[in-house]
């Protein structure tokens, strides 16, 4: 009988070393992964099936939802039958080129964000590409705890997931250990186009679909040649949410960090000891920088679980009994109080309707109802009723007329 590391083929016996057996297993795994990738690409079908008239018309209708008040959207929807056929022909002939985006800036919580809004005709192609190509091919390589820009997930889903992982950690280690927080620097502006093209070659095996995905990146507005993805473009969101997937897989599978995840460019991970968190933090930062993804080292922190920590503007506290408290942004209450006083002055001057003020108050209430912030919400509503109703009892605002005093 041949030894355990020997293969008998006919009259010949091949003796393999340990290194050769490891290499053979690696090649078999690699071949199976490539076979699965090819099967996923084949399941999409050819170019004319992916960009069929029916699918493009369906996603063209979805592009109009919520923005039908715009004149450009009304013109687009009015000529959707003929326009879809024209745009489909350019895509199949590989002559489609995106139009220039409308550039504007937003100030979000004091931070200026440049936004590039694509033309609605390009949004139809972007939405078809994302839903029919990028999402089916990118999702299998993404970890479950990546909660940004995915159907069925979101920011509050990520908060619930953190609470579940904190509970898992508490049942095994109590309040011992620490949380590692990392932030990627200029995630969208510093994205390397070479990394995105490489992902297309690895995951999009259809040459026509790969060329279309490359075209979207090639014509994306970016201040630095070969670097940067715009905010406000749907393929840009899908590309960036899946960009760090290799490092995510290393953290979860090879480093075996059970409680870890991220929301776009904000990372967190729970460890049994502070030293382990620091050691793993240095290794993760090294791997990000080796991959060409910048890390904001100023925002990288290791916080003991006996202290509260902040993630995506929310404050998490693990108590001694194991209860997990989640509080919303404290700065939001300060802004809301200032705005209510400003709105009252504008309301007395006739510059703002009371309906707008009610809508703003409902938005603030809806935000803080998602957290353990009953006290903050109660104090904010007391201020609201004291300003607009002269300290009247807290009853339905729609049944009570505001005072001008």
Give residue spans per PLM region:
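Active-site-proximal segment of RNA-dependent polymerases
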Residues: 43-46, 130-189
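Non-catalytic, polymerase-adjacent accessory regions of viral genome-replication enzymes
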Residues: 1-85, 401-405
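Right-hand nucleic-acid polymerase module
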Residues: 1-31, 118, 123, 127, ...
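Short Gly/Ser/Thr- and Asp/Glu-enriched loop/turn motifs at secondary-structure junctions
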Residues: 101, 261-265, 297-298
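Conserved pre-motif C helix in the palm subdomain of viral-like polymerases
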Residues: 112-143, 225-252
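Conserved polymerase palm-domain catalytic core
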Residues: 165-264, 268-283, 287, 303, ...
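Reverse-transcriptase-like RNA-dependent polymerase core
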Residues: 87-111, 208-221
